[in-house]
Amino acid sequence: MALVSQARSLGKYFLLLDNLLVVLGFFIVFPLISIRFVDQLGWAAVLVGLALGLRQLVQQGLGIFGGAIADRFGAKPMIVTGMLMRAAGFALMAMADEPWILWLACALSGLGGTLFDPPRTALVIKLTRPHERGRFYSLLMMQDSAGAVIGALIGSWLLQYDFHFVCWTGAVIFILAAGWNVWLLPAYRISTVRAPMKEGLMRVLRDRRFVTYVLTLTGYYMLSVQVMLMLPIVVNEIAGSPAAVKWMYAIEAALSLTLLYPIARWSEKRFRLEQRLMFGLLIMTLSLFPVGLITHLQTLFMFICFFYMGSIIAEPARETLSASLADSRARGSYMGFSRLGLALGGALGYTGGGWMYDTGRTLEMPELPWFLLGVIGLITLVGLYWQFNQRRIESAMLSGS
């Protein structure tokens, strides 16, 4: 037992460092895409939104297949291959001077994520015990926030010189992450049984409770992805400089590093997981309604704070609930399918968000996209409330134990 505990402990430290590299490499590049191609090159927001949505759709929509392959062949080969593929996507993005090249680069980056994301998520479940899982997710999310602001700072600084430097730096970090996994990641099996890929896929698809939960989250993700598209654009518009975007991520980092873990510890003893998820989504929804009417940067940052607070409350509960509902015989497949809501919500949020933003500007109604996003958030809340009351989930799962 002592050896098992030691292996779990070392594995969690490995996951934390690995996650830092992945987050840093991602946020050096992706928050700058909308600024580079919309603000600097003058492309239509819908074209850039389509590229970002394509990355999301490919990565998360095909995640169930990446997870099923990892269930069959193990985590390590999928993680290493996926990271190298993302590095190649970033290198191609540096050469994007036409929309189709950007779309191809984002698709390649998303395909890499399809391969490495589900097995990495399944490893978290494998290496953490149920009672500590929610807190470990909180630590990962705190790290995500810190990595996001550091990555955005580095990316913004590099963008002053050339967008090529932004992309190449992100690619190098993913190559380093791949090497880290080659060197130190053991050949873990992420599921309790090694079954054919089809069996894992069918096990997920027959689980109506899990499928309903995942698809309901589509609206939640439509809101959450706007930190990568419309929020950076509106911050840049009001501030008059892309340098202000880094402060948006600084706010997220400050709130996450100071509040995420304490809130998770406090709330897990007092509220059920679905209550935390819905309350966080409500705060996110209400904070988006007035954004289109704001003309001062300080006021905008205040509502962005509210949005991040909602995310801080909702995200650990959402991730823990997804892990609790996963069948240990097909962890990779379940974690891959759990990203389908993110795939649909991301594709709709990016593409639809870009279209709504362009339409709002054309009609001289800047509040239009934010009002529609708020309505989507309210509809999602109703869907979650119905699901959790019509399809009761075991209390042990919902309490996070």
Curated annotation (Swiss-Prot):
GO cellular component terms, A-Z: plasma membrane
Main localization, broad class: membrane
InterPro entries: MFS, MFS_dom, MFS_trans_sf, MFS_Transporters, Multidrug-R_MdtH
Gene3D superfamilies: MFS general substrate transporter like domains (1.20.1250.20)
GO terms assigned for molecular function: transmembrane transporter activity
Subcellular location: Cell inner membrane
Record CDD domains: MFS_MdtH_MDR_like
Membrane topology type: Multi-pass membrane protein
Transmembrane segments: 13-33, 34-54, 99-116, 139-159, 165-185, 214-234, 243-263, 277-297, 299-319, 340-360, 368-388
Pfam families the UniProt entry points to: MFS_1
Keywords assigned by UniProt, alphabetized: Cell inner membrane, Cell membrane, Membrane, Transmembrane, Transmembrane helix, Transport
Family to which this protein belongs: Belongs to the major facilitator superfamily. DHA1 family. MdtH (TC 2.A.1.2.21) subfamily.
Protein name, per record: Multidrug resistance protein MdtH
